[in-house]
Amino acid sequence: MEPAHVPVLAQEAVAALAIKPEGVYVDATFGRGGHSRMILARLGTLGRLVALDRDPAAIAAGAALDDPRLTLRQSEFSRLGKVLDALGIARVDGILLDIGVSSPQLDDAARGFSFRFDAPLDMRMDPGSGISAADWLATAEEEEISEVIRTYGEERFAKPIARALVAARQKEAITSTAQLAGIIAAAVKKREPGQHPATRSFQAIRIYLNRELEELKAVLPQCVERLRAGGRLAVISFHSLEDRIVKRFLRTESLGEQAPPRLPIPAAMLKAGRLRLVGRAQHASDAEVAANPRARSAVLRVAERVAEAGA
């Protein structure tokens, strides 16, 4: 197996799960198993861990763990409920989500996620499904490219970037990461200090092609449904769009059903919140950011499932 990669906020996230030795847990974003190893180290012989990842390379690497308490499944985490049903698991004691692309994916030039390497332009978390970045850029309309880069990358130069990409592909196909980064860099007239001009666009295309925000929106309600009372949900996000979705969802689920303004509905008739927020949002320490600059934008949010009335 590859050398163990320590995920961002790993200690904080696993500690937040308050692991019970005989509990059942889900690592919905296995990656290279950093979180899973830490969870397994805290589980007893009767404990169980279900780990998911849509990347076949992650599942192949995870097979080397060879732990009878670990069940690995190649799947998008939006299918969490179906995976648990297939395993005969109704409720779990904790779920961990580490959103976004993993460091091994970024560091593997062949995957085409990063402009740090000149490689074929792919960006798919599961190379066996969906459309590659090269194929999408070859056919997408200029307006669509602009909208994707603006929406998912929060890039203010989305329009000139899209215009430059469409003009460039008319001369030759955009098939490599270096080629894409160069076109974007030439189109961005004003650069952010300390950031490559292609950063936001690469991020936007990756998020769009892998439907990352849709996946997140789909899995969060399933997490609440599958947690037993007292079970914990820990979510690590690296992008403001992701964190916004997580923050709003957890807040809504903690508040419960709200009566319309000036409508006298008794509180007993309203559905209570299903979650209790646990502490404040956590960020990586200065020491962790110094050791791993990717930790700078990481945010950890934790919530606990509340027992339903009458349960």
Swiss-Prot record:
Top-tier EC class: transferase
Annotated compartments: Cytoplasm
List of residues binding S-adenosyl-L-methionine: 33-35, 53, 77, 98, 105
Molecular function (Gene Ontology), one example: rRNA (cytosine-N4-)-methyltransferase activity
GO cellular component assignments: cytoplasm
Role, per record: Specifically methylates the N4 position of cytidine in position 1402 (C1402) of 16S rRNA.
KW Lipid metabolism (keyword) present: no
Recorded catalytic activity of this chain's protein: cytidine(1402) in 16S rRNA + S-adenosyl-L-methionine = N(4)-methylcytidine(1402) in 16S rRNA + S-adenosyl-L-homocysteine + H(+)
Keywords: Cytoplasm, Methyltransferase, rRNA processing, S-adenosyl-L-methionine, Transferase
Protein name: Ribosomal RNA small subunit methyltransferase H
Enzyme Commission number: 2.1.1.199
Keyword 4Fe-4S attached: no
Family annotation (Gene3D superfamilies): Putative methyltransferase TM0872, insert domain (1.10.150.170), Vaccinia Virus protein VP39 (3.40.50.150)
Family under the similarity heading: Belongs to the methyltransferase superfamily. RsmH family.
Biological processes, Gene Ontology terms: rRNA base methylation
